[in-house]
């Protein structure tokens, strides 16, 4: 999940030039960003497009996406009149509440001048360097969305339900996320078989 990489109040970043600095963005904000991606499965632009008015306590309504400085409908054409809806699970609720201001309105993730936070900038200046220090590769915001799909699939959630959570227009789009999962499960199964065969071979040798 990577939330533990940003467990403090502030973040210390080690630059490639040997510099060490503390970015303006708080650790709590980065945790909330990751949680929205991982627990709600929102796309990059949809995360940027969230307003506090979209937070309805037990659900997020998805009305807009932000690309660069442009506010537009989401990839699946959700908007003010026909918003998408994603349940807010307890871990996400806690992390959103941690950054919620007293009079919450406007962007959930604002930048310093009142616009939508630039996730690409945060990724390059903050997240990637922290990942690197811990020996991890950044796979992109989409990886959290795919991870959510994978985890739901492993829990036995029907494809159509996962489709609704990820807000895909077609269930076939959802199912394509499981190609990797199926291969990983197959590899794991074959490794277990390999270990079993090794044990059987050892027993056979002892008998002989």
Which residues make up each language-model segment?
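C-terminal secondary-structure termini that scaffold catalytic or DNA-interacting sites
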Residues: 6-21, 68-92, 98, 102-104, ...
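Residue-level detector of conserved, well-ordered beta-strand and adjacent loop positions
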Residues: 3, 63, 89, 110-111, ...
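Hydrophobic alpha-helix feature that most strongly marks membrane-spanning transmembrane helices
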Residues: 100-101, 132, 153-157, 167-170, ...
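Short, polar N-cap/turn motifs at the start of nucleic acid-interacting alpha helices
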Residues: 53-61, 138, 157-176
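C-terminal catalytic core of tyrosine-transesterase DNA break-rejoin enzymes
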Residues: 32-35, 39-46, 121-122, 129, ...
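Basic, Lys/Arg- and aromatic-enriched nucleic-acid-binding interface segment
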Residues: 1-44, 48-50, 79-83, 102, ...
């Amino acid at each position: 999940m990577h939330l533990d990489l940003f467990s403090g109040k502030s973040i210390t970043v080690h630059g490639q030039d040997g510099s060490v600095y503390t970015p303006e963005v708080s650790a709590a904000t980065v945790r909330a960003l990751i949680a929205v991606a991982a627990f709600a499965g929102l796309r990059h632009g949809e995360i940027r497009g969230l307003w506090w008015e979209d937070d309805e306590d037990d659900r997020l309504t998805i009305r807009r996406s932000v690309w660069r400085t442009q506010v537009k409908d989401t990839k699946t054409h959700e908007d003010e009149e026909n918003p998408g809806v994603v349940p807010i699970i307890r871990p996400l609720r806690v992390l959103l509440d941690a950054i919620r201001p007293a009079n919450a309105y406007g962007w959930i993730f604002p930048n310093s001048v009142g616009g939508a936070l630039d996730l690409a900038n945060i990724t390059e200046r903050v997240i990637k360097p922290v990942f690197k220090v811990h020996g991890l590769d950044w796979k992109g915001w989409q990886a959290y969305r795919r991870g959510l799909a994978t985890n739901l699939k492993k829990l036995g959630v029907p494809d159509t339900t996962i489709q609704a959570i990820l807000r895909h227009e077609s269930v076939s789009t959802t199912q394509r996320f499981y190609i990797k999962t199926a291969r990983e499960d197959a590899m794991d199964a074959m490794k277990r078989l390999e270990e079993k065969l090794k044990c059987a071979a050892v027993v056979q040798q002892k008998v002989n």
